Each structure stands twice: as structure tokens, then as C-alpha cells.
Amino acid sequence: MHGALAAAVIDGVERAGGEGLLTPPDVDIAFYGDVFRKGSRRVRGDDEPGRVTDLDDELEQQLLLDLWEAAAVAEPDRVAAPTGEGTRAPTPLTAQRAMNALLRSRCMPGAVAERFLLGTLRQVRRYLKDNDIRRYAREAVTTRIASDTTVVIGHSLGSVVAYESLCVEPKSVGALITLGSPLGMPKLVFDRLDPTPSGGRAEWPKGIRSWSNLCDRHDVVASVKRLGPLFDVPGGWRTVNDQVLDNGWKVHDLGRHLTDEATGRAVIAALRLTHEG
């Protein structure tokens, strides 16, 4: 995993004109996915849902409906809009309708789309509601941040883990880069963050000097494309640099994000920021 991801980061930097700035040993990976596996020694295991009807938690069901709504807004030509489902409590029937609609979205990765989405929903729910999982995932991130770390990159749920890690256990790194992030998703993610947002604003991560947020225009996971209004420090002292990309048909794909020139530019800017002191 390290080799492929390191190569993708370096590719993005080189596309942005940073040839020779990074080598594979400069890139480290924080992995916490084992905590979600059934039989994990870290926490009590949990079955992965095999079908949409296995989503038995209200948070999972509501996340699915919110993704459906976001997909209908982003791709009205492909995804039919919900007709009042969002105003009622989720049911197995509406969850199935949401899944059927989402499978038409560009955000879903081909033949494994349903399995991917079901697993993602369960992981998000478990992270947000299980304190042991939350603590383990954040420790997996903070223990990999060294004194010479200049940028932290978080993708999808990993962006939530990275953000919370840097807030709860501040580290002096140059920059945070979030990719395909659900951080701005109201109520279900944003309002459940730690530290808890207040007055519609969340805390700026301590020790971070710059923050770039990138997502594809069709990415339903990153349903809120602009994080600035939610995380900027009043007065312009710190602002999120929000950018919308076009990842082609791999809308939410980590590799496509990392190799994008815009991500490379954000990494280069972080390296320069740290070098300039």
C-alpha cells in the first residue's frame, strides 16, 4: 500500500512542477482500517452489511438518504431526486430506493459499488459512535506524525480522522490537505465532530498553518464542497483553500485525487511554507 500511495503523491507533485522534491521514503502512511475488521483485537468486531437491508442503524440509513439527496443535486441527469423521503424516518424501503438511485451516480466505483458504499456507511457510523474506534484511529494518525512532518493528507473518512487528530492532539505541521471529505456534511458528520462545533463553526486545527480542501464536483461523499464557511478563523487569519476538481469517472478515488496537479500544488505550497519558517 505504501508504494502505490507514495508513487501517487510524488506523481501529483511532479505534475505540478515539483520534480525531485519528494522520494518514497518522504511519504508515510497511517493505517487504521484493521480496527473495522470483524475479530479485531483492538475493539469488538462488527459484521459488514451484505445488503442494504442490513443497515440497521438510523445514522447509517440517514447517511444513505443524505448521499442520495446530494447525488440528485450533483447529477440530476443520472440520479432521480428523493420525493419526500428526507422528511420521514428512514425505512428499509427508502434505504433500498436510495441505494438504487446512488448506483447510477458517477461516485460509485463500478461493479463493487454497493459493497463499497455499505462498508463505508458502517465505518463512518462506527467511527462517530464508538469511542474506542475513534481513539484507536486517531492514535494511528498522531503516532505517525514526526517532528519533521510538513503535511498531513486525509481522504474521505480519513479526513475526519486527520482533522480530529490534529485538534485533539495538536502537532506542528505545515498543512492539512483533505480530499473527498465529508467534514461539512451537516448534522450527521459536522455536528458530531470532536471538538464539537459551536454557532455553526468548527475549530481550526492547532498547529496547522494552511488547509487545502479538494473534491470532485460529482462527489456525493463531499456533499459540502466548501469547508471555508465552516472552519475559517474569523477575520481571515486562517482560511481553507477550497477547490473543486474533475476526476473523470473515478470521482471519489484516492489515487485520482493524489495524482491531480492541484493536490501536487498544495503539497508543494506546504513544503515551501515549512521551509520558509
Annotated model-derived regions:
Residues 1-44, 81-153, 157-277:
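Lipid deacylating catalytic domains
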Residues 24-79:
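N-terminal accessory alpha/beta regions
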